[in-house]
Curated annotation (Swiss-Prot):
Record's GO cellular component terms: extracellular region
UniProt protein name: Putative conotoxin
Subcellular location: Secreted
Main location: secreted
Entry PTM: Contains 5 disulfide bonds.
GO MF terms held by the record: toxin activity
Organism (species): Conus caracteristicus (Characteristic cone)
The record's note on its domains: The cysteine framework is VIII (C-C-C-C-C-C-C-C-C-C).
């Protein structure tokens, strides 16, 4: 019985740790088009479905850990997202994104 309780505590701690780390990086993309990691822990918001966290790129919706307004504006010479579409680096001032040569750029 003691072994079972110990294992249950360890399992609970591990799963809590994983959830807490899910959004340690505020640039992380939580979900895209309703798929992906819906376990992002965002304080005070439903970051995996809240429009304040949403970026639309070529008909696909990406939701980030922090609100889009919290990102700095892209300067035009840098990548907007990483190649795997898993992190947003900056936001486009006009809020319009597109894909050019396989990369996300401001439209």
């Amino acid at each position: 019985m003691k072994l079972f309780m110990f294992a249950a505590i360890i399992f609970t701690m591990a799963s809590t740790t994983v959830r807490a780390e899910q959004c340690a990086n505020n640039r992380k993309v939580c979900t895209w088009d309703g798929q992906g990691d819906t376990n992002c822990d965002c304080i005070g918001t439903a970051c995996h479905e809240d429009d304040a966290h949403k970026v639309s790129v070529a008909g696909s919706a990406f939701y980030t850990c922090q609100p889009i307004s919290a990102f700095r504006v892209c300067d035009g010479s840098e990548d907007v997202m990483d190649a795997g579409f898993s992190e947003l680096y900056c936001r486009c001032s006009g809020g319009s994104y597109t894909i050019s040569n396989g990369e996300v750029v401001c439209d």
